[in-house]
């Protein structure tokens, strides 16, 4: 992975011909080189399920932290689609049974939601769900988003913007949603001692749960705002963070009432409503809601206060600076990984093998920073 060697067969050939590789591996000039199957069988039988590659990667990250190469002052995280090594003819729709429950982003966030008025955990039930995968690599998933279309895997990675060093790598089927995965991806790094103060994400992560989850993790998030088509502001409502209330065009406050749960999706929304009879004689009542309604309500994200605080940072000098760093380091790191370190496509099959490939590529990208000579003052 350091030198772009894509297979065990080619690796064995390089060791056979390259004196430097022979010296590094401890082989004499006349020693026989082991067969390529020795490498592949050892990797799959002994190392793949041992957590060795994950532990080795985090050990390198810890050494970089100790050397001052990672400070966590500015970081960026993103997901990248990597195609699987499958043919179009192997695509197949499969029907699986999945347990449907509340959307879970982070344990601390779930605990906070459970304390809110109106919280009611939806009953867990098993539903049948169809998904597209491949007969040759059933762990992979199908994505059809923008210019990304195909069977593959999603690599979620975090990079420190001081030197562009990767601090976390996780791999999922491509059909998984990035915003549902990122908080646990970040939490795992924080538990391992990775410093994380400010984090830049793209607009795909602009959900109230992600904004609040970052606050619970002690991270200041910078996320571009999505222009939602039915936002309360579109109808003249404004949010007052001091009161945690929406103000209608007539100046009447809609206070937080309770959580509403969508039973089919497991998603929670905050219900804001007018508590008295102010709507009954309002001149704008006919245009505000239908005759069956008693008082005006507004449904917003279950973590709307944090969502609002995150949007207040949009457009600030700090926000613009973090967006520039995200474009340079997050997108740039993915480009280097795919171009120089053999993961433009996942060559092996199965999510364990895909994780192994991404971790080895990340280590190959990080090791040169750790080995580079530095001055005594760091």
Model-derived features: where do they sit?
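Anion-binding and metal-coordination hotspots
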Residues: 4-17, 26-378
């Amino acid at each position: 992975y350091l030198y772009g060697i894509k297979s065990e067969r080619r690796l064995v050939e390089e060791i056979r011909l390259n004196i430097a590789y022979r010296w590094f591996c401890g082989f004499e000039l006349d020693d026989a080189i082991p067969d390529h199957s020795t490498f592949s069988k050892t990797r799959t039988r002994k190392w793949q399920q041992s957590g060795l590659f994950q532990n080795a990667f985090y050990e390198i990250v810890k050494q970089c932290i100790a050397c001052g190469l990672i400070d966590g002052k500015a970081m960026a995280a993103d997901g990248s689609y990597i195609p699987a090594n499958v043919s179009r003819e192997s695509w197949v729709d499969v029907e699986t049974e999945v347990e449907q429950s509340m959307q879970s982003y982070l344990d601390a966030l779930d605990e906070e939601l459970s304390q809110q008025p109106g919280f009611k955990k939806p009953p867990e039930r098993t539903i049948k769900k169809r998904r597209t995968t491949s007969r040759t690599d059933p762990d992979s998933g199908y994505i059809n988003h923008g210019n990304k279309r195909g069977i593959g895997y999603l690599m979620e990675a975090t990079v420190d913007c001081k030197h562009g060093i990767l601090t976390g790598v996780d791999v999922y089927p491509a059909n998984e949603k990035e915003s549902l995965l990122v908080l646990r991806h970040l939490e795992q790094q924080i538990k391992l001692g990775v410093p994380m103060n400010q984090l830049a994400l793209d607009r795909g992560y602009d959900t109230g749960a992600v904004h609040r989850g970052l606050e619970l993790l002690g991270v200041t998030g910078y996320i571009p705002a999505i222009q939602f088509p039915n936002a309360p502001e579109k109808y003249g409502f404004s949010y007052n963070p001091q009161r945690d209330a929406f103000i209608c065009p007539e100046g009447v406050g809609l206070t937080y009432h309770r959580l509403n749960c969508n039973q089919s999706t497991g998603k929670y929304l905050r219900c804001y409503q007018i508590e008295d009879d102010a709507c009954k004689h309002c001149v704008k009542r006919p245009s505000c809601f239908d005759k069956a309604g008693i008082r005006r309500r507004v449904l917003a994200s279950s973590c709307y206060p944090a969502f609002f605080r995150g949007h207040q940072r949009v457009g600030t000098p700090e926000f613009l600076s973090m967006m520039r760093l995200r474009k340079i380091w997050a997108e740039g790191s993915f480009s280097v990984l795919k171009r120089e370190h053999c993961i433009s496509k996942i060559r092996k099959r199965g999510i364990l093998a895909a994780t192994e490939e991404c971790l080895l590529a990340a280590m190959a990208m990080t090791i040169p920073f750790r080995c580079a000579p530095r001055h005594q003052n760091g």
